[in-house]
From Swiss-Prot:
Residue ranges of the region described as Oligomerization: 300-331
Entry protein name: Cellular tumor antigen p53
Quaternary structure and partners: Binds DNA as a homotetramer.
Keywords: Activator, Apoptosis, Cell cycle, Cytoplasm, DNA-binding, Metal-binding, Nucleus, Phosphoprotein, Transcription, Transcription regulation, Tumor suppressor, Zinc
Task of the protein: Multifunctional transcription factor that induces cell cycle arrest, DNA repair or apoptosis upon binding to its target DNA sequence. Acts as a tumor suppressor in many tumor types; induces growth arrest or apoptosis depending on the physiological circumstances and cell type. Negatively regulates cell division by controlling expression of a set of genes required for this process. One of the activated genes is an inhibitor of cyclin-dependent kinases. Apoptosis induction seems to be mediated either by stimulation of BAX and FAS antigen expression, or by repression of Bcl-2 expression.
Family annotation (Gene3D superfamilies): 2.60.40.720, 6.10.50.20, p53-like tetramerisation domain (4.10.170.10)
Location of the protein in the cell: Cytoplasm; Nucleus
Stretches the record annotates as Disordered: 257-290
Length: 363
């Protein structure tokens, strides 16, 4: 008896039966071709902006390359988009927490205080561009080192309190899209934010930065001057513009700015702008030499007067001549009176009064 009759089940499918079933399935290539051909029946809808940028980046002929140098350049480069930086003018009062000196191209700020940076461009950069801020040492003997916070301030941050790594000097305030990077080749720290166009009625974009360590901290900057490099880059890392300025993190920004500006003007041979001299109107007459005689009696001191107008001069001259004549007459009267008094004096007991330069009679 056959097994099929005993169990009451159909025999298993053979290889020929499986091939017959597979041939009944539609061809996947033909299905995709039909679906692509059916796209012509739908109206043309524009792609999203993000998709357009993505296709341009993927289908472009030029392959973007990111340049990473051990010593970043500090030369200003506006680029074809005209990158410019501006700062708020806060003066040099003692109460300011952040002030910028255009003469020195230097920013003075306090620890962990807000430093508004105004970014301006002449034409909008490509979509998805970023602004990168990097701190480097200014002097050549220190430029190879990475700018970091001192161990004291680095340990003062509680884990999870700040999104930035504890060793990073710079922070971005009020922007949740900011992200912090460390270069794999040089180890330099940087903070990046997406570039956002100016708001309606404004000409610049504001980015709020913080410096989280003093310039005088031991183990950190250790009184070594630093520079901040602001670069405008594409999403692929291509440089579009660069600006640079010096930074000093101190306790009294206004005082330090005045001191450094005065020292700078002295080196250039100019007078500090702290005090202004009174402006005197120009005079056509040549200045007369000042004459002063050192005498004992105040009445014998000689003064020089500058008189405006010929008539006034003649009148005062006549008055002066009259006073001098009166003085000479008074002296003559005193001399005559003294002589008369001397002649009226008679010697006692018949003796002749001796006069000066007169010899006595010989006996």
């Amino acid at each position: 008896m056959e097994p099929s009759s005993e169990t009451g089940m159909d025999p298993p499918l053979s290889q020929e039966t499986f091939e017959d079933l597979w041939s009944l399935l539609p061809d996947p290539l033909q299905t995709v071709t039909c679906r692509l051909d059916n796209l012509s029946e739908f109206p043309d809808y524009p792609l999203a902006a993000d998709m357009t940028v993505l296709q341009e980046g993927l289908m472009g002929n030029a392959v973007p390359t990111v340049t990473s140098c051990a010593v970043p350049s500090t030369d200003d480069y506006a680029g074809k988009y005209g990158l410019q930086l501006d700062f708020q003018q806060n003066g040099t009062a003692k109460s300011v927490t952040c002030t910028y000196s255009p003469e020195l191209n230097k920013l003075f700020c306090q620890l962990a205080k807000t430093c508004p940076l105004l970014v301006r461009v002449e034409s909008p950069p490509p979509r998805g561009s970023i602004l990168r801020a990097t701190a480097v040492y200014k002097k050549s003997e220190h430029v190879a080192e990475v700018v970091k916070r001192c161990p004291h301030h680095e340990r003062s941050v509680e884990p999870g309190e700040d999104a930035a790594p504890p060793s990073h000097l710079m922070r971005v305030e009020g922007n949740l899209q900011a992200y912090y990077m460390e270069d794999v080749n040089s180890g330099r720290h940087s903070v990046c934010v997406p570039y956002e166009g100016p708001q309606v009625g404004t000409e610049c974009t504001t980015v709020l930065y913080n410096y989280m360590c003093n310039s005088s901290c031991m183990g950190g900057m250790n009184r070594r001057p630093i520079l901040t490099i602001i670069t405008l880059e594409t999403p692929q890392g291509l440089l579009l513009g660069r600006r640079c300025f010096e930074v000093r993190v101190c306790a009294c920004p206004g005082r330090d700015r005045r001191t450094e500006e005065d020292n700078y003007t002295k080196k250039r041979g100019l007078k500090p702008s702290g005090k202004r001299e009174l402006a005197h109107p120009p005079s056509s007459e040549p200045p007369l030499p000042k004459k002063r005689l050192v005498v004992v009696d105040d009445d014998e001191e000689i003064f020089t007067l500058r008189i405006k107008g010929r008539s006034r001069y003649e009148m005062i001259k006549k008055l002066n001549d009259a006073l001098e004549l009166q003085e000479s007459l008074d002296q003559q009267k005193v001399t005559i009176k003294c002589r008369k008094c001397r002649d009226e004096i008679k010697p006692k007991k018949g003796k002749k009064l001796l006069v000066k330069d007169e010899q006595p009679d010989s006996e």
